[in-house]
Amino acid sequence: MISPLPTDRLPMNDPTARPAGPSRAARPDRRKPTTPPARQHPLLDRLAQWYPALFGDTLRPLKRGVFQDLMAAHGDAIAEVDLKAALALHTRSTRYLSAVASGQARHDLAGQPVEDVAPEQLHHALVEVFRRRQARSPQDLAPQLQQRIERAFEASGLGREAYATLVRGKDEKINALTEAALEA
């Protein structure tokens, strides 16, 4: 025989039901599980040993065509698919995007500056770093982004229309922020 529910407890499907006793969050013996730090691709460790000026503690924007340069230099020691995966992780990292957003020149394998970052690539990096930081910040970082877009526009040497055409994207909030920066 099934025993009836005790009168002091509410059924589980009742949205107003609360468990008796302290909540899990209030229990002092409960600890949040720690997530291990994200591991980077093992090949990035080797690239940091081979090219510390590019992949070490301080990241620098990579020149266009660096994949081909790395394959030419180390094709016998690394698999093409591994290099693609490692560079994809590297160039999408917040640290790398911050280096691009800083306005540094692109660098070759010798660590020498070889070309400027294109204005639209700099703008993309600024916006992506902003989005990632804004997601973690309680304060509005849009004014800081607007100032950085103003500086990037001035450094580009382009006219307002040319710059706006290059950097216009699908996000209307970012487009409005960019327009405000160009009018300042």
Task: Annotate each PLM feature.
Residues 2-15, 112-184:
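Intrinsically disordered, low-complexity, charge-dense segments enriched in Lys/Arg
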Residues 10-11, 15-31:
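Intrinsically disordered, low-complexity RNA-associated tracts
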Residues 31-54:
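N-terminal, Lys/Arg-enriched amphipathic/low-complexity engagement segments
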Residues 35-38, 42, 61, 137-140, ...:
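Alpha-helix boundary/N-cap detector
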Residues 42-49, 68, 72, 85, ...:
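Charged/polar, solvent-exposed surface patches and flexible loops
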